[in-house]
Amino acid sequence: MERIRLKLKAYDHRVLDRTVAAIVEAVKRTGADIRGPVPMPTKIKRYTVLKSPHINKDSREQFEMRIHARMLDIVAATPDTVDSLTKLDLAPEVNVEVRAMGK
């Protein structure tokens, strides 16, 4: 079969690492070869808002969101590997993007 690339994103890195560990364990049980997890750069989104609703522009508050990401490559995936990945119960906070790639 082809190579499968998984990109996982989450706001909490602890939940992301637990999910990656569960995926790696499930893939290794089926006998497929896995590359990764590769930690991707953390994306930081910053927002600045005024504290006051009317005046005083000098008084501001800053917020940020950190998006942590990991990448996994499953090489020589078998049908059992795909079946175990679809049956895996993952955390709802983690966004998983799956792409099947050529050899």
Curated annotation (Swiss-Prot):
Gene Ontology BP annotations: translation
InterPro entries membership: Ribosomal_uS10, Ribosomal_uS10_CS, Ribosomal_uS10_dom, Ribosomal_uS10_dom_sf
Organism superkingdom: Bacteria
GO molecular function: structural constituent of ribosome; tRNA binding
UniProt keyword Ribonucleoprotein present: yes
Pfam families: Ribosomal_S10
Family statement: Belongs to the universal ribosomal protein uS10 family.
Subunit structure, interactors included: Part of the 30S ribosomal subunit.
Function according to Swiss-Prot or TrEMBL: Involved in the binding of tRNA to the ribosomes.
Protein name: Small ribosomal subunit protein uS10
UniProt source species: Campylobacter lari (strain RM2100 / D67 / ATCC BAA-1060)
